[in-house]
Amino acid sequence: MSDKNQIAARASLIEQLMSKRNFEDLGNHLTELETIYVTKEHLQETDVVRAVYRVLKNCPSVALKKKAKCLLSKWKAVYKQTHSKARNSPKLFPVRGNKEENSGPSHDPSQNETLGICSSNSLSSQDVAKLSEMIVPENRAIQLKPKEEHFGDGDPESTGKRSSELLDPTTPMRTKCIELLYAALTSSSTDQPKADLWQNFAREIEEHVFTLYSKNIKKYKTCIRSKVANLKNPRNSHLQQNLLSGTTSPREFAEMTVMEMANKELKQLRASYTESCIQEHYLPQVIDGTQTNKIKCRRCEKYNCKVTVIDRGTLFLPSWVRNSNPDEQMMTYVICNECGEQWYHSKWVCW
């Protein structure tokens, strides 16, 4: 892998670690960047300046901030040095250029100046901001069209995968989710001709789920785990059958809730639980009783009521209202047929 590829990969990894706030592994990547020879082209064609500048601004570790500041000061000197050479290059004196080439390696005073800047940490925040503004805008335009030479020689498929991973940090996670969905879809059927079909289903389902929860990665992961668990459940074989038959499209499946993905037995069980809970906590609304026109409703003052006998416990009365005498536990309960008013009176004698 060339230096440019290594720098781009390190910058992408630093961005991912900063987004996850995982500061423990940043030191290794910054140390590797110190050992790599960085040129002006590397700074312009990669995203390394923005990544290191983000470490300098957002990392809580003082040691990592010093490393980032040292790297930025070193790169600033390299950037200024290349600019000064481009301006003062002797184009009309080739003999002088040959002498310089034959003179052999010599210590450049700008390198000593760079080391001095790095050791004293005299780089101000304004200088760092200027450096990032000079280099990063050019970098953004280049990153939109990555070239194959960034990744060296290799297969076009691997090159495309690497470029997409560098551009989007969520690509490895989404690829893993597609693999999990594919494994869950093929868990019940092992037919080889359907492998491509299941692969397309897994990719479409993942795309729709990512569209729904692209702004919340936690909800995205939770939804994927729910889909995988329901697809792997042997009692939910109807989900694969509906996808194969076209009854359920991948988009509809991605939008299905946990209640909708459940099988018929589980739905009936939940309905029975709900009905039993309602019955347990349901106050008596309509009670069969004796029709009478001798009682006047206290709300509508009409004589159209029903009279019955009911236990105090049915009304969920507190213990201090109830009497310990079992003969007095029964009360006369009246329901108006006109307005629905309900009331009771414990002093009435009922036979």
UniProtKB/Swiss-Prot annotation:
Pfam families: Med26, TFIIS_M. GO terms for biological process: DNA-templated transcription; regulation of transcription by RNA polymerase II. GO terms for cellular component: nucleus. Residues 173-289 form the TFIIS central domain. Gene3D superfamilies: 2.20.25.10, Conserved domain common to transcription factors TFIIS, elongin A, CRSP70 (1.20.930.10), Transcription elongation factor S-II, central domain (1.10.472.30). Residues 103-119 have a biased composition (Polar residues). Residues 86-119, 144-169 are annotated as: Disordered. It comes from the Eukaryota. Residues 5-82 form the TFIIS N-terminal domain. SMART domains: TFS2M. Residues 145-165 have a biased composition (Basic and acidic residues). InterPro entries: TF_IIS-typ, TFIIS/LEDGF_dom_sf, TFIIS_cen_dom, TFIIS_cen_dom_sf, TFIIS_N. PANTHER family: TRANSCRIPTION ELONGATION FACTOR A N-TERMINAL AND CENTRAL DOMAIN-CONTAINING PROTEIN, TRANSCRIPTION FACTOR S-II ZINC FINGER DOMAIN-CONTAINING PROTEIN. This is Transcription elongation factor A N-terminal and central domain-containing protein. It comes from Homo sapiens.
